[in-house]
Amino acid sequence: MTTTPKSEQDRVIIFDTTLRDGEQCPGATMTFEEKLNVAAMLDEMGVDVIEAGYPFASDGDFEAVHEIAKRSKNSVICGLSRAAHKDIDRCAEAIKPAERGRIHTFLSTSPVHMKYKLQMEAAQVYEMVISSVTRARNHTDDVEWSAEDATRTEFDFLCRCIEAAIKAGATTINLPDTVGYAVPEEYREMFRKVRETVPNADKARFSVHCHDDLGMAVANSIAGVQGGARQIECTINGIGERAGNAALEEVVMAMRVRQDKVPYWNRIESKMLTHASKTVSAATSFPVQYNKAIVGRNAFAHESGIHQDGMIKNAQTYEIMTPETVGVKGTSLVMGKHSGRAGLIHKMEELGYKLSRNQIEDVFVRFKALADRKKDVYDEDIEALVDEQLLHGQDLIRLKSLTVIAGTHGPQRATMKIDVDGQLRIEEAEGNGPVDAVFNCIKALVPHDAKLELYQVHAVTEGTDAQAEVSVRLSHEGRSMTARAADPDTLVASAKAYLGALNKIVAKRQRDVRQDAPAVAVAG
């Protein structure tokens, strides 16, 4: 359990309708096996009621609800049904194997629904409420009745229908904001007034079911609980009709994090929330938006330098819950163009590097340049930058600029500027391909007789903007020297790697002859 219950009166039942309302979202259809997997996960994570489907809709829905009812270990298994007796009977048959089963029947009560959808008078609707709930109660003691479009229903008629449903045997009364029309204060007051007005309101548990058409499904759900409801109907990732439903992960964590304002508890194991999100996303092929609350990729990610600095000092500066609480391994300091020195230093320390102040400054300058060119900077990118600094930070020969002209006609041409121990040199050369042109340019700038033994390229990370890491091995006077370099531009990385190997030859010869290397090794 995620919280210690204060009293049964403060307990909120979590009613998950991912497999019913969630699957009604266009494109979110799940296979039989996927439904079973999702249901097993919901059962394991502590969902009180699983609305497994609408058995009358199809044989496939019936079979899924029936099989889930067989397999459930902890949750109440619920089936949805219209007010028609044949629907209710089919639903009862589907949930029959469940140790604890529920029939959820509904009927529209708003003027617009009664007139245009049902084409019935209020008196007819009232009688059908009694008839349908009575029929359902003949099959099971656990019956939920929903007043579809409750938030647009005339208050007096709504109260009459609720009273009749409870008298007929309904144990849960659901008042949905079917079209996401309500605002929190209005929804809270509706529950408060209904519970005050309906004489037998204390004989049933009240439930919220909110849609997100105005982006207030979660806020309205919490408001309904504050107004006296003790069941929240919701879905994993908030999937559902049109703009979706209240997201289970959000209502659960709102109750956990804001106990001061929302002092209620539930049975959900919050450490499974991220896993649940990924499971449903995979089953429905609906990606979770990056900035989705609680379970989005960026929910515990920080790129801003100011935020990263605060997080390094104390995570509570910018996080109101720990990532581990919802099943995320830890906070992510995302390295990008908004990151500062503190974030970069922290990341380098995480990766096991300890650099001097001057080395850090050099890496930071190159990191900023890389971040401006690359959408995402990964750990591997940071490692490549640091490795290049450690390997080539004291190099005698440094690349200053490179321009390559390439195309389908004529030879490729490279123009390069380098710094040789403080002396700038510039040259251009042609080649059979852009890499050949770059290497010929280096040979013109730094005449040498080293032979190229290896040239190898691979991507440091994924994506078209990934850094290329190039390895070059040169042989000279019986010795082989290998160097590698990384850059988003493969040709720049190639030039840096070649120069890196050349620098190793220079350094080796300098040690061997014990004299000034520039005049001996890079003359010309």
From Swiss-Prot:
Record's catalysed reaction(s): 3-methyl-2-oxobutanoate + acetyl-CoA + H2O = (2S)-2-isopropylmalate + CoA + H(+)
Name of protein: 2-isopropylmalate synthase
NCBIfam families: leuA_bact, PRK00915.1-3, PRK00915.1-4
CDD domains, per database record: DRE_TIM_IPMS
Keyword vocabulary terms for this entry: Amino-acid biosynthesis, Branched-chain amino acid biosynthesis, Cytoplasm, Leucine biosynthesis, Manganese, Metal-binding, Transferase
GO MF terms, alphabetically ordered: 2-isopropylmalate synthase activity; acetyl-CoA C-acetyltransferase activity; manganese ion binding
Signal peptide residue numbers: none
PANTHER family referenced in this protein's UniProt entry, alphabetically: 2-ISOPROPYLMALATE SYNTHASE 1, CHLOROPLASTIC-RELATED, HOMOCITRATE SYNTHASE-RELATED
UniProt similarity note: Belongs to the alpha-IPM synthase/homocitrate synthase family. LeuA type 1 subfamily.
Cofactor(s) required, per the database record: Mn(2+)
Subunit details: Homodimer.
Ranges of residues in domain Pyruvate carboxyltransferase: 12-274
Localisation per UniProt entry: Cytoplasm
Functional summary from the UniProt entry: Catalyzes the condensation of the acetyl group of acetyl-CoA with 3-methyl-2-oxobutanoate (2-ketoisovalerate) to form 3-carboxy-3-hydroxy-4-methylpentanoate (2-isopropylmalate).
Positions bound to Mn(2+): 21, 209, 211, 245
Entry's EC annotation: 2.3.3.13
This protein's pathway: Amino-acid biosynthesis; L-leucine biosynthesis; L-leucine from 3-methyl-2-oxobutanoate: step 1/4
Spans annotated as Regulatory domain: 398-524
Biological process annotations from GO: L-leucine biosynthetic process
Keyword Transmembrane recorded: no
InterPro entries tied to this protein: 2-IPM_HCS-like, 2-isopropylmalate_synth_dimer, AIPM/Hcit_synth_CS, Aldolase_TIM, LeuA/HCS_post-cat, LeuA_allosteric_dom_sf, LeuA_bact_synth, PYR_CT
Recorded superkingdom: Bacteria
